[in-house]
C-alpha cells in the first residue's frame, strides 16, 4: 500500500515526450514507445485524458487531446485517430474560452503554442477564428505583462515551467537553472522533454528514461511524488480516524521522511507543500524538526516563487496547517500563520487564487481549515468531515490532470465508515450506562446542579473514541459530571459548613456515612465521589498492576480545597493578586479529576516516579491555566454580573485604572496563546520526556475540547453543541461506495 506510489499516466506529458526527435534522424521519434501508447489509448469519444473526467476539466482534456494529435501528426501515424481527436476538439471548442472551466497551469500560453505548431505540421484545426483570436489575445497579454510583472523570480519560474509553450523564444539558459539533481525541470516530464528537445541535455534524458523505465511507455504529469504521496496517505488515515490500524506502516513512512529531512532531500525542500506537510506530520509525531526551514517560504519569498506566482491555494493551506504546530518563541511560524490565514480568507471571499482541482472542493477544505483550527478540532469531528468529503476519484491538475491511486482509496473509506459506526454503537451503549449511573448516584436530585452528562460524554467520545479506551471514556465522563456538580455546589448550592464537611469526609475517606453528613446534599455528593473514585481505582489497578486510588483521592482534594479558597475570597470580598488567583485557578478550573485519573486507563504503565515527575505537573499547569483563561475571557461579562473573581477583572484592577476591558482581554488572549503553545511543546517533545505520549495526549485533547466549547462563547450554554455532539454519538455516517 505504501511501497508503490501509483500515479495516473498523463497523455499530455506523454505526447511531449513522444514528440522528441531521435538523435539520428529528425524524421523519427526518440521514444517510439510513447507514440505507440498514444495510438493505443485514445478514449471512445476521440479524446485523450483521464477516463470519467470532471465536467469542469474539459480544457485539460482538450490540451491533452491536441498534444496527442500533434505527436501522431508529427510522426505520420494514426490518421484515423487524428481525425477523431480533431472532431472531439471541434465539438468541445466552446470550452476553450469558458471562464467557468478549470484552467490548467499555463493553458493560455501552451494551447496557442500548440495551435501554431499544428499550422507548421499543416494540420487543419476545426476551430472558429474568433475562438483562436480570443486565445491568442490572452496569450499575448500573458506573455507581455503577466499578473506578477515580467522580472520576478516567480514569473521566471512560471515561464520555465511551461517551457514547451514558449518554444524557440524561450531563454533556455534561464530554464536550466531549475534543473534538479534527478535531471528534471520541476519534476515535470513535459518541461524536461521540451528542454531535452532543444538542448539535448544528458541529465534531462536520464530523467526521462528513468520515468519510462518505471511506467513503461507513458509518463505521469509529475514525477517523483513519492514523499508527498506517502505523507498524504498518513494524513488521510489520521483524518479518517483509522491510523491506529496502520501503525507499523505509518512508522516506516515517518522514519523514511525524517531521514530524508536530515539529508536535505530535494523532494522535500524544493517543494513547498511537501516541506510543510513533512514538518507538520513529523512534529506532531514527536520528531525534532526546526521551523527555521520556513525561512525560504516567508510571505515575500513564497510570492516570489512558482507556487506564489500561481497563488496556489493548496500549498498555502498546507503552510497554514504547519504554522499551527507552534512552539513558544517561533515568530516565523506566527507570521506564517498570519499571512496564510489572510490569504485563505481572501481566497474564500474572492475566489481569485489558483486551485489544483474543482474550486468547490478546495473551497470546502479551506473553509473547514479556517473554522476548525488544530487546537479546536476534535478528532471524531475531523473524522466525520473527512469521511463525508472523501473523494475516491479526486483529481488534481497542474499542466495536466492526474490522480494518485494510493490516496483515492475505496478501502480506506469503507474501513473508516465501518470503524466510525462501530465505535458509535459502543458510545451509545456507554451513554445509556452513564444515564443509569446518574440516577443510581441520585445526582439528578441535586436541583442546583447543571445536568451536563451529554457534553461530558461527548468530550470523551470525540477524543478517546477507540473501543479499547472504554474505561478512560467512562472515567473522563463521570468525573466531568461530578466536577460540574461540585462546581455548582461550591458556587451556589452549598454553605461554607457543607463545603468544609465534604472536604473533611474526603480526607477521612473511610467514614461511617450515617453520622458525618451535615446535609443530604453532602451525603449524595460524597457517596457519588467515593464510589466513583473507588471504581476508577479498581479499573486502574487492572491497567497499572498497582493501587493508584490514593492519587485519585488527592486529585479531588486539591480541587475541592482550591474551590473553597475561591468561595472564601468571594464571601469575604477579598481581592487576590492576579498571580494568587492563577496559582489557585488552574486547579479550581476542575480539569484535574477529568484528565489525571484517565492517565492510568489509556495503556502505558505509570510508575510512582512518573506520577511525581515535574513534567506531569507542567503539563497539568499549562492545560489548567489555558482553560482558566479561556473561561475567564469568554465568561467575563456573565461572571462580572455574578460578582465572581475573574482574570480579566483582576488584570483591570491591578492596572489601577490604566487598563481597560479591551486591553485586559487582549493580554489574556496573548497568555492563552503562549500557554497553549507551551503545552503543545510539552506534549510533542520526545527528548528529556519521561511521560508516555499516550498520556501526554490527554492534556492536548482536553485543550481541544475547551477551545471548541469556548470558540464563540461559554460553550456549556451553546445550542450548537447539541448537533455537534449528535454527529459524534448518535448519527451514523453513510457509505457511498460502488
Curated annotation (Swiss-Prot):
Q: Which GO terms describe its molecular function?
A: ent-kaurene synthase activity; magnesium ion binding; terpene synthase activity
Alphabetized UniProt keyword annotations:
Lyase, Magnesium, Metal-binding
Q: Which cofactor does it need?
A: Mg(2+)
Q: Which reaction does it catalyse?
A: ent-copalyl diphosphate = ent-kaur-16-ene + diphosphate
Q: Might you give the EC number(s) for this enzyme? A: 4.2.3.19
Q: Which residues bind Mg(2+) 3?
A: 631-632, 639
Q: Tell me one Pfam family matched here.
A: Terpene_synth
Per the record, its GO cellular-component terms are: chloroplast
Give the cofactor note: Binds 3 Mg(2+) ions per subunit.
Single GO biological process annotation from the record: gibberellin biosynthetic process
Q: Identify the pathway.
A: Secondary metabolite biosynthesis; terpenoid biosynthesis
KW Metal-binding (keyword) present:
yes
- Residue span of motif DDXXD motif: 487-491
Transmembrane region(s):
none
Q: Which residues bind Mg(2+) 2?
A: 487, 491
Per its UniProt entry, which superkingdom is the organism in? Answer: Eukaryota
Which annotated residues bind Mg(2+) 1? 487, 491
Q: Which InterPro entries match?
A: Isoprenoid_synthase_dom_sf, Terpene_cyclase_plant_C1, Terpene_synth_N, Terpene_synth_N_sf, Terpene_synthase-like, Terpene_synthase_metal-bd, Terpenoid_cyclase/PrenylTrfase
Question: Any idea what job this protein has?
Answer: Diterpene cyclase involved in the biosynthesis of labdane-related diterpenoids (LRDs) natural products. Catalyzes the cyclization of ent-CDP into ent-kaurene.
Which family is it part of?
Belongs to the terpene synthase family.
Q: What is known of its domains?
A: The Asp-Asp-Xaa-Xaa-Asp/Glu (DDXXD/E) motif is important for the catalytic activity, presumably through binding to Mg(2+).
Name of the molecule in the record: Ent-kaurene synthase-like 1
What's the gene?
KS1
Amino acid at each position: 500500500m505504501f511501497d508503490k506510489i501509483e500515479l495516473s499516466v498523463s497523455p499530455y506529458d506523454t505526447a511531449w515526450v513522444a514528440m522528441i526527435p531521435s538523435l539520428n534522424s529528425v524524421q523519427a521519434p526518440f521514444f517510439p514507445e510513447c507514440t505507440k501508447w498514444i495510438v493505443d489509448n485514445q478514449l471512445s469519444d476521440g479524446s485523450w485524458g483521464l477516463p470519467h473526467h470532471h465536467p469542469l476539466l474539459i480544457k485539460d482534456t482538450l490540451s491533452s487531446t491536441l498534444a496527442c494529435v500533434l505527436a501522431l501528426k508529427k510522426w505520420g501515424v494514426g490518421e484515423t485517430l487524428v481525425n477523431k481527436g480533431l472532431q472531439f476538439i471541434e465539438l468541445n471548442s466552446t470550452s476553450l474560452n469558458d471562464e467557468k472551466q478549470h484552467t490548467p497551469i499555463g493553458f493560455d500560453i501552451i494551447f496557442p503554442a500548440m495551435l501554431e505548431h499544428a499550422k507548421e505540421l499543416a494540420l487543419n484545426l476545426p476551430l472558429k477564428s474568433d475562438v483562436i483570436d480570443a486565445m491568442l489575445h490572452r496569450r499575448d497579454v500573458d506573455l507581455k505583462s503577466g499578473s506578477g510583472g515580467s522580472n520576478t523570480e516567480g514569473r521566471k519560474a512560471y515561464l520555465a515551467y511551461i517551457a514547451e509553450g514558449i518554444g524557440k523564444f524561450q531563454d533556455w539558459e534561464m530554464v536550466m537553472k531549475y534543473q534538479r539533481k534527478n535531471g528534471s525541470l520541476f519534476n515535470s516530464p513535459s518541461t524536461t522533454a521540451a528542454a531535452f528537445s532543444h538542448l539535448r541535455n544528458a541529465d534531462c534524458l536520464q530523467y526521462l528514461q528513468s520515468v519510462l523505465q518505471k511506467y513503461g511507455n507513458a509518463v505521469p504529469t509529475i514525477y517523483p511524488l513519492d514523499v508527498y504521496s506517502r505523507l498524504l496517505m498518513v494524513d488521510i488515515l489520521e483524518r479518517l480516524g483509522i491510523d491506529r490500524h496502520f501503525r507499523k506502516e505509518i512508522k516506516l513512512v515517518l522514519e523514511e521522511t525524517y531521514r530524508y529531512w536530515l539529508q536535505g532531500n530535494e523532494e522535500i525542500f524544493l517543494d513547498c507543500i511537501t516541506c510543510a506537510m513533512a514538518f507538520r506530520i513529523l512534529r506532531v509525531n514527536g520528531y525534532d524538526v526546526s521551523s527555521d526551514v520556513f525561512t525560504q517560504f516567508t510571505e515575500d519569498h513564497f510570492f516570489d516563487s512558482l507556487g506564489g506566482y500561481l497563488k496556489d491555494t493548496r500549498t498555502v493551506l498546507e503552510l497554514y496547517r504547519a504554522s499551527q504546530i507552534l512552539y513558544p518563541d517561533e515568530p516565523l511560524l506566527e507570521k506564517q500563520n498570519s499571512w496564510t490565514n489572510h490569504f485563505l480568507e481572501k481566497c474564500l471571499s474572492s475566489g481569485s487564487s489558483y486551485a489544483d482541482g474543482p474550486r468547490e472542493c478546495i473551497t470546502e477544505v479551506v473553509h473547514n481549515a479556517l473554522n476548525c483550527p488544530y487546537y479546536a478540532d476534535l478528532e471524531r469531528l475531523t473524522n466525520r468531515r473527512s469521511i463525508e468529503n472523501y473523494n475516491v476519484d479526486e483529481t488534481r491538475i497542474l499542466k495536466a490532470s492526474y490522480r494518485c491511486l494510493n490516496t483515492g482509496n475505496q478501502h480506506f473509506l469503507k474501513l473508516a465508515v465501518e470503524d466510525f459506526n462501530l465505535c458509535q454503537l459502543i458510545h451509545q451503549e456507554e451513554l445509556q450506562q452513564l444515564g443509569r449511573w446518574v440516577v443510581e448516584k441520585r445526582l439528578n436530585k441535586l436541583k442546583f446542579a447543571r445536568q451536563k452528562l451529554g457534553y461530558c460524554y461527548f468530550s470523551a467520545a470525540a477524543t478517546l473514541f477507540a473501543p479499547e479506551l472504554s474505561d478512560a471514556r467512562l472515567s473522563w465522563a463521570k468525573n466531568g459530571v461530578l466536577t460540574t456538580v461540585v462546581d455548582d455546589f461550591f458556587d451556589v448550592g452549598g454553605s461554607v459548613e457543607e463545603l468544609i464537611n465534604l472536604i473533611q469526609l474526603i480526607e477521612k475517606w473511610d467514614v461511617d456515612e450515617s453520622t458525618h453528613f451535615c446535609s443530604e446534599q453532602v451525603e449524595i455528593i460524597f457517596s457519588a465521589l467515593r464510589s466513583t473514585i473507588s471504581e476508577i481505582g479498581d479499573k486502574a489497578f487492572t491497567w497499572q498492576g498497582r493501587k493508584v486510588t490514593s492519587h485519585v483521592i488527592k486529585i479531588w482534594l486539591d480541587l475541592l480545597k482550591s474551590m473553597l479558597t475561591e468561595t472564601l475570597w468571594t464571601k469575604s470580598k477579598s481581592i487576590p493578586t492576579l498571580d494568587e488567583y492563577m496559582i489557585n485557578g488552574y486547579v479550581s478550573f476542575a480539569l484535574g479529576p477529568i484528565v489525571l485519573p484517565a492517565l492510568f486507563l489509556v495503556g502505558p504503565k505509570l510508575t510512582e516516579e512518573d506520577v511525581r515527575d515535574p513534567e506531569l505537573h507542567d503539563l497539568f499547569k499549562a492545560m489548567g491555566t489555558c482553560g482558566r483563561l479561556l473561561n475567564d475571557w469568554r465568561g467575563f461579562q456573565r461572571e462580572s454580573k455574578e460578582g465572581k473573581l475573574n482574570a480579566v477583572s483582576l488584570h483591570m484592577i491591578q492596572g489601577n485604572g490604566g487598563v481597560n476591558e479591551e486591553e485586559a482581554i487582549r493580554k489574556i488572549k496573548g497568555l492563552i496563546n503562549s500557554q497553549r503553545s507551551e503545552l503543545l511543546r510539552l506534549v510533542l517533545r520526545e527528548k528529556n520526556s519521561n511521560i508516555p505520549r499516550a498520556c501526554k495526549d490527554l492534556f492536548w485533547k482536553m485543550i481541544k475540547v475547551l477551545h471548541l466549547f469556548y470558540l464563540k462563547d461559554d460553550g456549556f450554554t451553546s445550542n450548537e453543541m447539541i448537533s455537534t455532539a449528535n454527529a459524534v454519538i448518535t448519527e451514523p455516517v453513510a457509505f457511498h461506495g460502488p
